[in-house]
Amino acid sequence: MGEAPPMERLPYLSDRVKDNLKANKLAEVRAWCYDKQYDPITNPDGVVALAIAENKLMRDEITKHINENFKINPWHLTYGEGPAGTTALRRHIASYVNEYFRPSAPVKANHIATCNGAGPAVNNFCFCVGEPGDGILLSKPLYTGFFGDIEHGSKFKLVQVPMEGIDPVSVEAVAQYEETLHQAEASGTKIRAVLLANPHNPLGRPYSKEALAAFCSFCDKYNIHLLSDEVYAQSWFLSKDFPKPEPFVSILSLDLEKYINPALIHVIYAMSKDFCANGIRVGCLISPSNDELLSAFKSISGFTRASQLAEQVWLNLFEDGSFLNWYFPEMRRRLADSYAYVTGRLEEQAISYSPASTGVCVWIDLSEYLEHDTRDAELALDWRLARAKVWIAMGATFVSEKHGNYRITFATPRADLELGLDRLFKVLSDIREERGLMTGSNGYA
């Protein structure tokens, strides 16, 4: 096959999509690793993937439940009740949210619209609340997938909020958002919303009630939306780092009228994280006090509808209360065990990390292993690790404010996790030997 023609020779593509195709060398490691992932049976010589935020600890149980409880019938082959979700599923999502998110006012089925995942929900939300070029505020570091969710479809602008050493999930962070809002609007970008990942990805900690209240007051002051991505709501765990962790607090649990016009508050949830099913594309927007936004969201849902099959799988799980009563505590136990294993091994190698109490990843510091304090050096280390058949996510893709941060997914089967860490530490040991540095307690760096 011949090489692809240069971009300037592609007049048949729109300018808006050409922006999506601009070269991004930070994504090249991911592209190289994706189809080489390790599997002990089908690809034993592959790359151990510790970069993707997937919870693999309960996959067997979820798979078993699906296979035992799902059967296609002719109704699944129809358009069903339309693109924004069946009444049955939306009722069960509402019941689930009322039980686990503890909203200050009950969530109802008509407050919810479904789609094919959390990412499409973010895209649709942006499409509805502003114009191309308008901005949505997110603090650094941030989940790298938000770039595509926000910018590739709706053509919103992801406006990055620098933290400069301030904890992103703290009350103090709000001042950074306010300063960034003023700077953005002075340069011509109208800010329409704030997006919080609660719990935070990649840092793995929830926002406190006080911090959420402060963000609500900030958004109310400027009449901008607050979108809370709560896909890790159930993925919390106990650890020696946080024996009494800050509990997950949904934005919906606040007495919102004290802080903000409730019509500005919205939540995204999906099956991907808490239910260990990134590949089953179904999620939702929850907006209890803004019927107009929900109507707008539904008006474009035909482009992002979840399949009847995906909706039925999630519905079956919601309907099985006894399974969920076992499943979530067991998931948390396994998350805690896996987190303890990874952080213990990191400590053996004197590798610092950001303590976490939620999510499936840990944020680590490998800055001492960089050749130089640059993004290119960070990318070079990521490539070296990938070629040594271990893939971790580099901090630059999360717009980390420090070079040398990486994210490791610890919610991985133990054998795979052990193999991946062995490969990681071997590379770090080699680097230390090349520099004449001492090795760690196990012979690794």
What residue ranges belong to the model's regions?
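N-terminal small-domain helix-loop-helix segment of the aminotransferase-like
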Residues: G2-G117, N124, P168, E172, ...
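Conserved PLP-binding catalytic core of the aspartate aminotransferase-like
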Residues: L335-A336, Q349-R387
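PLP-dependent aminotransferase class I/II
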Residues: L264-T358
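Helix C-cap/helix->beta junction micro-motif
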Residues: K221-Y222, Q349, A388, I431
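Conserved core of the PLP fold type I
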Residues: P74-K221, A233-P262, H266, R423, ...
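PLP-dependent enzyme catalytic core of the Aspartate aminotransferase-like
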Residues: S95, P103-P106, I260-N261, T374-D376, ...
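Hydrophobic residues in well-ordered beta-strands that form the structural core
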Residues: L138, Q160, S228, I392-M394
